[in-house]
Amino acid sequence: MGNIFGHLFRITTFGESHGGGVGVVIDGCPPRIEISETEIQLELDRRRPGQSKITTPRQESDTCEIISGVFEGKTLGTSIAILVRNKDARSQDYDEMALKYRPSHADATYDAKYGIRNWKGGGRSSARETIGRVAAGAIAKKILQQVAGVEIVAYVKRIKDLEAIINPETVTLEEVESNIVRCPDQDAAQKMIDLIDQTRREKDSIGGVVECVMRNVPKGLGEPVFDKLEADLAKGMMSLPATKGFEIGSGFAGTLLTGSEHNDEFYTDEAGNIRTVTNLSGGIQGGISNGENIIIRVAFKPTATIGKEQQTVTQTGEETTLAAKGRHDPCVLPRAVPMVEAMAALVLCDHLLRHHGQCKTV
């Protein structure tokens, strides 16, 4: 049904934007992992609405409740259920959208597939579905850090045509969180903030690119052929709302190079470890992690729901116009950063457990 992600570390998200709440059930989490609602809340606060002038003004605290699977601050090894209740839905803002399709949104395709849709807030197509992913990602991050020292940092690389200069090898979470757009390049960040604010006033939206670096990833994660590590990362990222592209390492720019230019030559470091001189592979070769930093980029389109009037049709095919009401992000990128980190953590945690189960080397 498309609501389940992962093999051994498996999540099932549930809930709708204007329903009673949203959440996640996590299966396969190892026992005795220390976790608290406070730790999960820190991640949820990074993606919650209403956090700044460049995000949706919907006011939700997104307070998480651990319903099961954790006892006295430690995971039990049983299913973990986490719930976040919706508190600030305004369904009346969507009355017009009950009949009219939003251009480039899921309204028309949900109707085409199911013959029915929840037009209040978009139902399952709303980005509030990602709350469950971010909550589960907080636990996955904890496992990765404890077992292997893995660190995951995502940040806004580009907004429209404004591109930041960022070193993925050294960037820190503190630098990312130092401004409301989550871009560690301070000069570029202010220009991005001004552009998003201007776009919001014009009742329009813009997109961009989130880059993510995964450090200290053990060698050997990933399965041959269909479950290659980059394939699962791509699936995870492309399952996020508004995503339109995925790159790893050199990405499409690598097509402009020759093999001798693109190949990451090997050497042995002072500790006797096999390393690569360059990292155009992005930390993965043959679908398996090679121990170098994994670097990916995810493209997000402009938010589909905008206040600017556009041509559309009704459910019965009558041509009309729509200037959408409601509270929506003029740019999803600042809030997409923790979503990208969460999906990266979920993929890596799942592959870490799978690798340990088969090879016993982590």
Swiss-Prot record:
- Disulfide feature: none
Pathway it acts in?
Answer: Metabolic intermediate biosynthesis; chorismate biosynthesis; chorismate from D-erythrose 4-phosphate and phosphoenolpyruvate: step 7/7
Which positions are annotated as binding NADP(+)? Answer: 47
Cofactor note text? Reduced FMN (FMNH(2)).
Question: Which residues of this UniProt protein bind FMN?
Answer: 124-126, 286, 301-305, 327
Q: Which residues cross the membrane?
A: none
User: One GO MF term, please?
Assistant: FMN binding
Listed A to Z, the keywords are: Amino-acid biosynthesis, Aromatic amino acid biosynthesis, FAD, Flavoprotein, FMN, Lyase, NADP
Q: Which reaction does it catalyse?
A: 5-O-(1-carboxyvinyl)-3-phosphoshikimate = chorismate + phosphate
Stated EC number for the protein is 4.2.3.5
InterPro entries for this protein: Chorismate_synth, Chorismate_synth_AroC_sf, Chorismate_synthase_CS
A single GO BP term for this record reads: chorismate biosynthetic process
Tell me the cofactors it needs.
FMNH2
Q: Which GO terms describe its cellular component?
A: cytosol
Recorded family membership: Belongs to the chorismate synthase family.
Quaternary structure (record): Homotetramer.
Functional summary from the UniProt entry: This reaction introduces a second double bond into the aromatic ring system.
- Can you name this protein? Chorismate synthase
Annotated source species? Gloeothece citriformis (strain PCC 7424)
State the taxonomy lineage: Bacteria, Bacillati, Cyanobacteriota, Cyanophyceae, Oscillatoriophycideae
